[in-house]
């Protein structure tokens, strides 16, 4: 019978679904294992990146089931967001209709690939029964003081007409549409992620070994902890003070001017009445609209403008001019910098440009620096000079002493600063979860009552082509009653950042379908944390950091007793075409549906898993998918062409008594060795490619010995056992093929429900081994010897080999290198 993948795959997908083979329940006596791939945005069609990601997860899920684990492997849809809204505008339809149609199509595509999902747990974040709980979390976070509203400079995408978090601005461009991001002052809702900065940083240690070092480093750097001091500088002739954060309080006596960010709240007060108003305002407007990455680049030309105001150095008493500078950022530290040009490179460059004074206050050992001769700032260690009572101290000691003085004299304090900023979750778009607050003239900002949730997104709306949200123009939505006083009020028309939905979906999977609470306490405790999370490294900062924060916040609200959501993380590589990322605009997209129709799902899965280790990128190639197809057909023919009347054998079930000849001994040893290697490669390193390669070698050996082994009953037992092991090992990778062939072998049970084969250590031992013999590093002979032959005997046998004798004739043997069981190398000259 010819291999017909479409018919076979449809058959077994139906059987698995009918028998609920992948249903999971908490409370089993088996150990639990929760494997999860990052859920997709329902764009309409899956791509090869999806196939690779989900195939990796499916192999892990199926393998763990075979190992005896109670496996949770769910799937859902990250369904809110700007792309759906923009697509709906483009196609003149509603985002909900567009989204749910795409979900239906993508679900069908995923089912065609035979992934072992528990589809009963499917969720879509745009479903009100999902985001009602998110709105409840919002209210709980408000009670905890973890959510607040403030007016602040925000990243604004003029094309998307919405605010972006700092993490969503890539090289000064919107992460979704690549438009140049502008700065606007807007009132927004923020999650106080900075309250967890220290815990987020410290708990990275718990993830060491389970997460890639690269991701841990990225999060460590993004959180960006700095230890230093906050110092207050009084504004001359005013009651105002400017606070600065510095990691170098030892250099405060060398501060000769102040630099503040264009966004600093004191700018207007400082310039009023100085005659500098127009100059400063023009500079501020220009710099605020600059690319944020450009403003932080080392190559940025330092620019500034004098405000006309001065401040007083609290230690030296120096009257220092205050400049607005392009390299100072409002979101880092306090938005103000005490400039120490002799000991900071940016300040040095700025001071030279604007002819500002320098004071050397740290002298290196064995040298004497002077401002006139310095060509660059000195940022190293040394002895403090020109620093009043602190002169003569090593500068590291001076840091502590000056910080103590500042605290004692009410001029500052020791403090820790973080690069991490609070998370802006307000979005001025329609297709998102409504923020559950109202604005009342009498009561102010009032949270919606929990019993009134969900605040539903109105579906009877018309999206706007200009990108503006229709919620602010839908009275049926925004007109409401104040939950506190009952008077007329206005509902918030911003929606939540879609990263909020993806920050807790993995927890909801444990209790999907529970309409009484966001989580079933027992199910949550049983399943979390996720044992293996799989997704792209591009989510290292955004999604993964937000999810870590969200779990800690939910913990502190009493929802769970958990510190970290994902015990282990695998960041898979991309699928490329000719070295470039696949994209429709480049015309280099490979359609998975077309490949499945041509080759079958198992072949597509096999190629994606065999092409490269999972963490590395790989190039799609027609020859590669053809090679995978040949191997699948080769396995099919191996079983199809077995001798008639063979009884079904369990994997690794033949005995040493069945091995009456060399071929049987060799196949039995190879079978057990392959089971050991493939299991270890999948279990320990997710090296599916090497596991598949090992099975391929066993299949090749079976083709060479099939006729010989099929000649007698004992040989057929060895053959049947090895073939069954091949199918069991390939079952997580090519499940439909293996299930069909398993049935053809006469087995009454389903391969999906069987355990992973168990190898026998004794079966791994060989009676004889083949030893390669080299002369001066070149292979000259191979000899078959009893296993365990010692060094002296191997040397003697090697030197007696005819081809070795011929290649050492007339030479003197200088050395014989022997590795028992492995190789012999004769060194002669």
From Swiss-Prot:
A motif ('HIGH' region) lies at residues 40-50. InterPro entries: aa-tRNA-synth_I_CS, aa-tRNA-synth_Ia, Leu-tRNA-ligase, Leu_tRNA-synth_edit, M/V/L/I-tRNA-synth_anticd-bd, Methionyl/Leucyl_tRNA_Synth, Rossmann-like_a/b/a_fold, tRNAsynth_Ia_anticodon-bd. It catalyses: tRNA(Leu) + L-leucine + ATP = L-leucyl-tRNA(Leu) + AMP + diphosphate. A motif ('KMSKS' region) lies at residues 581-585. GO terms for molecular function: aminoacyl-tRNA deacylase activity; ATP binding; leucine-tRNA ligase activity. GO terms for cellular component: cytosol. Pfam families: Anticodon_1 (PF08264), tRNA-synt_1 (PF00133), tRNA-synt_1_2 (PF13603), tRNA-synt_1g (PF09334). It is found in: Cytoplasm. ATP binds at residue 584. Keywords: Aminoacyl-tRNA synthetase, ATP-binding, Cytoplasm, Ligase, Nucleotide-binding, Protein biosynthesis. The keyword ATP-binding applies. Gene3D superfamilies: 3.10.20.590, HUPs (3.40.50.620), Isoleucyl-tRNA Synthetase, Domain 1 (1.10.730.10). GO terms for biological process: leucyl-tRNA aminoacylation. Its EC number is 6.1.1.4. It is an enzyme of class 6 (ligase). HAMAP family: Leu_tRNA_synth_B. This is Leucine--tRNA ligase. It comes from Oleidesulfovibrio alaskensis (strain ATCC BAA-1058 / DSM 17464 / G20).
């Amino acid at each position: 019978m010819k291999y017909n993948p479409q018919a076979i795959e449809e058959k077994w997908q139906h059987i698995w679904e009918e028998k609920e083979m992948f249903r999971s329940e908490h409370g089993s006596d088996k150990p639990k294992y929760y494997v999860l791939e990052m859920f997709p945005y329902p764009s309409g069609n899956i791509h090869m990146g999806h196939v690779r990601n989900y195939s990796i997860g499916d192999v892990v899920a199926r393998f763990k089931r075979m190992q005896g684990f109670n496996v949770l492997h769910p799937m859902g849809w990250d369904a809110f967001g700007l792309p759906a809204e923009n697509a709906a505008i483009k196609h003149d339809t509603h985002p909900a209709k567009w989204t749910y149609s795409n979900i239906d199509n993508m679900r069908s595509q995923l089912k065609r690939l035979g992934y072992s999902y528990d589809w009963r747990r499917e969720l879509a974040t745009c479903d009100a029964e999902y985001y009602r709980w998110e709105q409840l979390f919002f209210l709980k976070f408000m009670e905890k003081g973890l959510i607040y509203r403030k007016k602040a400079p925000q990243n604004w995408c003029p094309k998307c007409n919405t605010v972006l978090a700092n993490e969503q601005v890539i090289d000064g461009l919107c992460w979704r549409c690549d438009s140049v991001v502008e700065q606007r002052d807007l009132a927004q809702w923020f999650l106080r992620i900075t309250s967890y900065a220290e815990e987020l940083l410290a708990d990275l240690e718990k993830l060491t070994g389970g997460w890639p070092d690269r991701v841990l480093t990225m999060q460590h750097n993004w959180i960006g902890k700095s230890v230093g001091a906050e110092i207050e500088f009084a504004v001359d002739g005013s009651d105002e003070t400017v606070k600065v954060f510095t990691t170098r309080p030892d250099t405060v006596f060398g501060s000769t001017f102040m630099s503040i960010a264009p966004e600093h709240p004191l700018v207007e007060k400082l310039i009023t009445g100085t005659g500098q108003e127009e100059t400063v305002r023009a500079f501020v407007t220009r710099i605020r609209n600059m690319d944020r990455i450009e403003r932080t680049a080392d190559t940025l030309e330092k620019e500034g403008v004098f405000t006309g105001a001065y401040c007083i150095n609290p230690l030296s008493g120096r009257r220092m001019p205050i400049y607005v500078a392009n390299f100072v950022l409002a979101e880092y530290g306090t938005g103000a910098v005490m400039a120490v040009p002799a000991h900071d490179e940016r300040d040095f460059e700025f001071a030279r440009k604007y002819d500002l004074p320098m004071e050397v206050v740290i002298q290196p050992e064995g040298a004497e620096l002077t401002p006139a001769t310095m060509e660059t700032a000195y940022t190293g260690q040394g002895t403090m000079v020109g620093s009043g009572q602190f002169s003569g101290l090593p500068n590291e000691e001076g840091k502590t002493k000056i910080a103590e003085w500042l605290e004692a004299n009410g001029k500052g304090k020791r403090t820790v600063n973080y690069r991490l900023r609070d998370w802006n979750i307000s979005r001025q778009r329609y297709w998102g979860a409504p923020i559950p607050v109202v604005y009342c003239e009498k009561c102010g900002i009032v949270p919606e009552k929990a019993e009134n949730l969900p605040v539903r997104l109105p579906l009877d709306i018309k999206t706007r082509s200009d990108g503006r949200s229709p919620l602010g123009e839908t009275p049926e939505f925004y007109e409401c009653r104040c939950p506190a006083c009952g008077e007329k009020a206005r509902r918030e028309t911003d929606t939540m950042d879609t990263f909020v939905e993806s920050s807790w979906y993995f927890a909801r999977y444990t209790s999907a379908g529970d309409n009484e609470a966001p989580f079933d306490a027992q199910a949550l405790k049983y399943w979390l944390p996720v044992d293996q999370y799989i997704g792209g490294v591009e989510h290292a900062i955004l999604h993964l950091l937000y999810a870590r924060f969200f779990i800690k916040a939910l913990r502190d609200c009493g929802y769970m007793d958990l510190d970290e959501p994902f015990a282990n993380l695998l960041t898979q590589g991309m699928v490329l075409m000719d070295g470039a990322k696949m994209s429709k605009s480049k015309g280099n997209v490979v359609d998975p549906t077309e490949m499945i129709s041509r080759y079958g799902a198992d072949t597509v899965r096999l190629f994606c898993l065999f092409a490269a280790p999972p963490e590395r990128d790989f190039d799609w190639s027609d020859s590669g998918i053809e090679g995978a197809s040949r191997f699948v057909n080769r396995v099919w023919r191996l079983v199809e062409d077995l001798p008639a009347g063979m009884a079904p054998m369990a994997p690794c079930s033949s005995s040493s008594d069945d091995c009456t000849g060399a071929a049987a001994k060799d196949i039995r040893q190879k079978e057990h060795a392959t089971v050991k290697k493939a299991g270890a490669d999948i279990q320990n390193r997710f090296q599916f490619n090497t596991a598949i390669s090992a099975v391929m070698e066993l299949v090749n050996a079976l083709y060479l010995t099939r006729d010989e082994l099929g000649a007698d009953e004992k040989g057929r037992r060895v053959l049947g056992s090895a073939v069954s092991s091949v199918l069991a090992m390939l079952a997580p990778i090519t499940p439909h093929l293996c299930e069909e062939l398993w049935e053809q072998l006469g087995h009454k049970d389903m391969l999906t429900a069987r355990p992973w084969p168990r190898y026998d250590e004794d079966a791994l031992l060989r009676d004889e081994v083949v030893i390669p013999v080299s002369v001066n590093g070149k292979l000259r002979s191979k000899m078959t010897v009893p296993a365990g032959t010692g060094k002296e005997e191997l040397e003697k046998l090697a030197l007696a080999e005819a081809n070795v004798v011929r290649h050492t004739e007339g030479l003197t043997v200088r050395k014989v290198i022997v590795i028992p069981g492995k190789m012999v190398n004769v060194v002669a000259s």
